[in-house]
Structures are given as structure tokens and as C-alpha cells.
């Protein structure tokens, strides 16, 4: 299993990743925003994604989004193909995405939103803390990404204060002593 920073050569997996995210949303019955293959391809092409491959078979994926002129970094679209679940792969992918975020945006507030129990567990194990949505980016472009989620009406009705998702933030890198 190889977990690596995605490059242009990995764009061939964008459609498969998009379908995997869609299928996961259907199976779970909870909200997951849809990501088009074209959108995922831009993340891959820009080096703002991590892909896991077993030989040449897609196994998992996650990407980085930057908001507020680099003040916020979101980890989004974490997905593991069904045949690779239950092996700790999601946590390994998330760690790699975290390392890339630290390398590129060392002072950014790193966050994510999820309805998934598995992602919540991973985030907790990696030191993320649950927070109110007011502690996340106020960039309207970020919140537009939620429009394809079936729970978007909740988010809009509450003026982005509440949803079924839980926001989590990692503060660990912001409190490390400088040497």
C-alpha cells in the first residue's frame, strides 16, 4: 500500500473517488457533500491531495482546502474504498494530509466537518477537538461546498450555526514550543 501526495498522473482516479464518496453517502444515509471528478482533479493537480494506492488500485483519498488567505486549512473528502476499510488506512491518510498541511501552512487553523463516526474517532485520536461552527472559517466559499449535502437546509436555517456535522479543529501544532 502506498500513501502519497497526489500528482497529475493520479487524475485518472478522480471519477472513481467521486463515485466512492457518493456511494458512501448513500450507504450511510447521512450528509456528505458531493464532489465532482473535475473538482477532485483540481485538488490532485495542485498537489493538495493524498491518495492511497494498492498496486494501481484506488484505496483511499483526502484533500486540502485553504480558506481565509491561508488562515484556515480544511481536510475534506476523506474516503476509503469499501474493500480497504477496517485496516487503519483512513487514519494513515489523515496523518499524511496533516503533515502536508503543516508543511505548507504551519500557522493555519486545521479543521474538518463530518457526520461520520469513524472520522470523528480518527480526529479525536489525532488530537482534534470538537468546536462550534463559529470557530471555523467564515469564508462563504467554504460553506458553498455544503450545498450538495442533503442537510444543507439545516445549515442555512440556522445561519451556519448548527448542522448534523461536527466541526473539529487541531490546535496541537499551534501550541507546540518553537525551537
Regions found by a protein language model. Give the residues of each.
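A conserved beta-strand-loop-helix scaffold within acyl/acetyltransferase catalytic domains
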Residues: 29-49, 53-54, 58-80
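Conserved active-site tyrosine of GNAT-family acetyltransferases
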Residues: 123-125, 172
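Conserved catalytic-core motifs of GNAT/GCN5-like acyltransferases
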Residues: 127-157
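Conserved small/polar residues in nucleotide/adenosyl-binding loops
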Residues: 172-178
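Short amphipathic alpha-helix that is part of the acyltransferase structural core
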Residues: 1-35, 51-53
Amino acid at each position: 500500500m502506498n500513501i502519497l501526495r497526489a500528482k497529475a498522473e493520479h487524475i485518472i482516479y478522480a471519477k472513481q473517488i467521486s463515485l466512492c464518496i457518493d456511494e458512501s453517502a448513500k450507504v450511510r444515509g447521512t450528509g456528505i457533500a458531493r464532489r465532482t471528478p473535475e473538482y477532485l482533479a483540481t485538488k490532485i493537480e495542485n498537489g493538495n491531495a493524498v491518495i492511497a494506492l494498492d498496486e494501481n488500485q484506488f484505496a483511499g483519498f483526502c484533500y486540502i482546502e485553504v480558506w481565509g488567505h491561508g488562515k484556515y486549512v480544511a481536510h475534506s473528502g476523506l474516503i476509503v474504498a469499501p474493500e480497504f476499510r477496517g485496516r487503519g488506512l483512513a487514519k494513515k491518510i489523515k496523518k499524511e494530509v496533516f503533515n502536508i498541511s503543516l508543511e505548507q501552512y504551519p500557522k493555519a487553523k486545521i479543521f474538518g466537518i463530518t457526520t461520520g463516526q469513524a472520522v470523528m474517532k480518527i480526529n479525536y485520536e489525532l488530537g482534534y477537538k470538537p468546536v462550534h461552527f463559529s470557530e471555523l472559517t467564515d469564508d462563504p466559499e467554504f460553506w458553498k461546498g455544503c450545498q450538495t449535502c442533503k442537510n444543507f437546509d439545516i445549515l442555512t436555517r440556522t445561519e451556519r450555526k448548527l448542522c448534523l456535522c461536527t466541526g473539529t479543529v487541531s490546535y496541537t501544532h499551534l501550541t507546540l514550543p518553537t525551537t
